[in-house]
Each structure stands twice: as C-alpha cells, then as structure tokens.
Amino acid sequence: MPTRDAAETTPDDTLPWYVAPLPTRLEDLALRLAWVIAAINVAGTVFGFWYYRIQLADTPLAAWIFVPDSPMATLFIAASLVAYKLDWDADWLHALAFFGCLKLGLWTPFVQLVVNGQGALWWGMYWFLVLSHFGMAVEAFVVHRYATFSVPAVGVALAWYGINDLLDYFLGVLGGPHHTLLRAELGADAPHALYAHDIAAACAVALTMLATYLALATHIHATEHRR
C-alpha cells in the first residue's frame, strides 16, 4: 500500500508564524516519524482511558464519549497521522486532531498549574500530565502540513468541541459533570457553582475559539497563496 513521506509535503512558507510556529526541520522530523508518533498516541489513549476509569464508572454509558477528552484527542491525532501516511482524504479527521491536541494540550497544563496544583497527586504523575499535554499542543502544529482545514472540516471539529464545552460546563445532562474533575469539585454538592469550574470553563471555551481561528486562518492564507 503506497504511503506518503515528509518530502511529499512541502511546507507553506507564506503562513504566518502564529499558525505555523514550529521550525520546518521539526515538522519534517515529525512527519518522517509519523508511524512512531501515532503509536505513542495510541498508547497515550489507552493510558488515558485507564486514568479516567474511576470517573467513567460513575458516568452513564451514553455520556462516556464526552468524558475522556484527552484520550479522544490522542486517538484523533493518531488516526490523523495514519490517514496522512496512507493518503486518505480525511480533512474532517485532521481538523478534529488539530482542535483536540491544541485545546487539551493547553487546557490541561493550565488547569493543573493554575487551578488544581499538585495536591495529593504523585509529583511524577503530575509533571507527566503537564508535559505530555504540552507535547500534544506541539504536535497540533504539524497537522497544517497535510490538512487543508476546509470550512466543512472545521465545522465538524467546532461542532464536536462546542458540544463538549456545552455538556462539560453549562448543561447538566446525562448525569454530569463530564469534564475532568477538578480537585476543588471532589465531594462538592454543586461543582458547577465553584469559581474553579468557571475558570476551567472559560479556558475551554477560549481554546475552542482559538483553534477555530487558527484553523480558518490557515485555510484562508493557504487559499490566497494558491491563487
């Protein structure tokens, strides 16, 4: 089965730095190691579902897909890289991967460092969560090398993560909360009334907006360059 490599994916030097902040050499390296990075993300997905096992046990089955946001993001990027290597037409998947890795890659470190703190969590696990999620944000900025971020594809990603935000922070349906439980929310009678919840919600919505802007900006700049 034919596959693609980094040499077939020419970087667009016209893109502004804020949509393509990584050095081209780093992008090329990531694309050459796409299979390895996809495998690492699959492993991260498995670990992530294990990490959420306690919260999932208390969540109705119908809402499970909305709870493990980070594992879903690593699953999206793994599938996106596989689709890239096999030259599949899956721009909607690439958009989901970009949104997920950027959003969760920045939301989790922010919440851990600013809202949660280490608490009783083992320091090794704490910093693993922070740094591994930063890595997700970095790999998000490789996706533009093979994605077009078409308007319909961005619409799919915006719908998915917009619905996630609504269910996680604003609509108490399906036996929530569905977001990653914050330390301040453990044992709380009304977790959505806490200030920590408001901060986490604001960060999530802002990052969904940021991902939408960056994806559409990438699409617009690339389209203008091709004219």
Labelled PLM ranges:
Residues A97-I163:
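Membrane-proximal helix-loop-helix units in multi-pass membrane proteins
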Residues Y146-R227:
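Terminal transmembrane helical module of multi-pass membrane proteins
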